[in-house]
Amino acid sequence: MNLLQLGKLHENVLDAGCEPNRNARYLASLGYKVVGIDISERAISKAIDKTSSEKSNVNFNQRDFSRLNEFKGHFDTVIDIGCFHSILNSDHEPYTASLSHICHSDSSVFLRAFSETNKSRYRRWQGHKRYSLALKRNNVKKLSL
């Protein structure tokens, strides 16, 4: 599904778990102001190296997603392609609380994660039901596409 075609991407974008950083770099090339974060220092170093010769609206930061206090209400769009389902179950609540903190009432959050209905991919990850509960508890509205 192409998020650009849906018209749901807005000016200030957070790419959560941004490795390999192609989404952040692509959106920045289209004029979006993008912050890419990843807990991996190596991933951020690679991202910075790739963009060092580019003039773009992207900043990469090595951060724990649950500690983004300075971004209160800042992001119009959050994209998570595989980060949320990779974290420990005990980190789901801090993650979704952070989502609630960094978004405003009109923000869009796009979260792609494994589902328990996809048996070929489902292993130790929790499925969409658990994700939905964590999002709901932290007042992150769910939109199914």
UniProtKB/Swiss-Prot annotation:
Function noted in UniProt: Probable methyltransferase.
GO-annotated molecular function: methyltransferase activity
InterPro entries tied to this protein: Methyltransf_25, SAM-dependent_MTases_sf
Keywords of this entry: Methyltransferase, Transferase
Pfam families, per database record: Methyltransf_25
Similarity-based family: Belongs to the methyltransferase superfamily.
UniProt KW Transferase keyword: yes
Entry annotated with the keyword Coiled coil: no
UniProt GO BP: methylation
Class in the EC hierarchy, top level: transferase
Protein name: Uncharacterized methyltransferase C750.03c
Disulfide topology: none
Source organism of this protein record: Schizosaccharomyces pombe (strain 972 / ATCC 24843) (Fission yeast)
EC numbers, comma separated: 2.1.1.-
